[in-house]
Amino acid sequence: MAALGGLTHSRTLFVDDDGTPMSFYVPPGPLKRQLYPLITHGGGEMCRMQQPGALLLSAPGSAQGAQYVSTAYIMDCVRIDKLLDVDDYRLDGSHGRPRKSQGSKKEERAPQQKVGESSQESDQKQQAKVGGDLEEGDKLSDPGEPVNEESLGSVSSTRKKENKMDCSEAQKIGSLKSARIHQTRRNVFTEKEDVAIMLYVRENAPHRGTGVSLWKEMEQKQVVKRTWQAIKNRYFRYLKGKRNYVLPLTDDSSSQEPSDDEEECPQPITKKSRISDSTPCTEKPGVAEKTGEKLSTDTSVEGPSTEKSDAAKTSNVNLPVEERGQEVTEGAIKRSEGNKKSTEMNEEAVSASSKENQDDGADLHIFEIANLEFEVEDTPELEVPKRSFGLKEFVMGEDLPSSQSQTQVDEVSSSPDASESEGLQEALLSMMSEFKLSLCDVTQALLKNNGELAATRHFLQTGSRPDGYPIWVRKDDLDLQKDDAETLKRLIQKYGADNVAKRVAFLAS
């Protein structure tokens, strides 16, 4: 940099005749930092990445090939302040050594360096010329005589032709590759392939498709001649949930996607449809109207009941135990009454439809079966449990939330033995107020002490049982239910035989 005299070369050194700047590319590094000011000062451009038309500069020995140009090209052009021939500096594999320009060859080449030519053809030509000169003049030229310029010109011209041929061949190969790349286009899915994919998914895996096993099976069985990735992408992007195709009917109609034609034929809403495929799609308007009225009445009856039950659940949190128990009982009675009303209305709708349409007895019989099936399957969800709850079911475990335990206390209040439930509630409320604990904490303490109120109160006061034995834990309860003699012996040693017997009876109650 210092030898260059502070960048004294021309500002248009690396500018073409038409005024466009020459483009160069050098990999990032110290060499790029060194050449960047030289190129930009001469009017050239330094590309950040490889671009078509840019000269790829490389240090001698680092890269080889006709597409690379030695960095000595930039240094020589800046030193002479003249744009030299690029082909003389291309790295064509001669161990990374650049070719020198014609001017440097004229200055440094001597007669004794003719034998050291890199090409064998040039050596043979020069030897033939030297032999011809000897035969004519019978003497050798002195070392101080000038070199024949015609021979040097012929050698340089042959090298230029070879380099141009190499570059042209490389360009042809690159153009052919790019043409092949542009010619290859993705095959579009046909309608037949889409239908085959949808049929296979419907018949083999109607509820499965998130994994890769289904799509790999389709690729192995060659349902369509595509990769499993392409099949999966096609299904989830363009086929799933869209009604572009009408698939043929099969036996498994539950997994079939509904088409536009099928939507025009309304059918009764049932959880398990047992209507055969031979049922006609056309119905009389009277039957359809009755069915619609029946379904609307069902939803109107069930809607308020569910809203009231939700409101009751939210209000139960801030009410006392007795009021919550009464509200739960009233809500269950209201739900059962609403259920009975809906059942009666359904029966009336079915009987009315059967009277009006006696000619279509077979079709109406099918609708009656479907409606009754709908009632039988839905009514058990709203039934009030009639069995009584014991203390074990009153508290399910140590991790039970307080809201669930409060609901179970309300259900205990509706058991047949009202005196015992009232006494239990009073004892729970008294311990809650005395020790300032929640209902969940008190019931858990009661469960750990086999349901004994005195032992539970002593445990809440002192933190231990009156007899000095430890408190029962859930792991020991699970071990106690196993028929293992060693485990039973260990529990007897830990809790005592009397406590183990009481615990077995308590868990069995």
From Swiss-Prot:
Biased composition annotated in UniProt, kind: Basic and acidic residues: 159-168, 286-296, 321-344
UniProt-listed Pfam families: BRCT_2, Myb_Rap1, Rap1_C
Keyword terms: Activator, Chromosome, Nucleus, Telomere, Transcription, Transcription regulation
Disordered, as annotated region: 93-168, 249-359, 399-423
UniProt keyword annotation of Transcription regulation present: yes
PANTHER family: TELOMERE REPEAT-BINDING FACTOR 2-INTERACTING PROTEIN 1, TELOMERIC REPEAT-BINDING FACTOR 2-INTERACTING PROTEIN 1
Protein name as catalogued: Telomeric repeat-binding factor 2-interacting protein 1
Gene name per UniProt: terf2ip
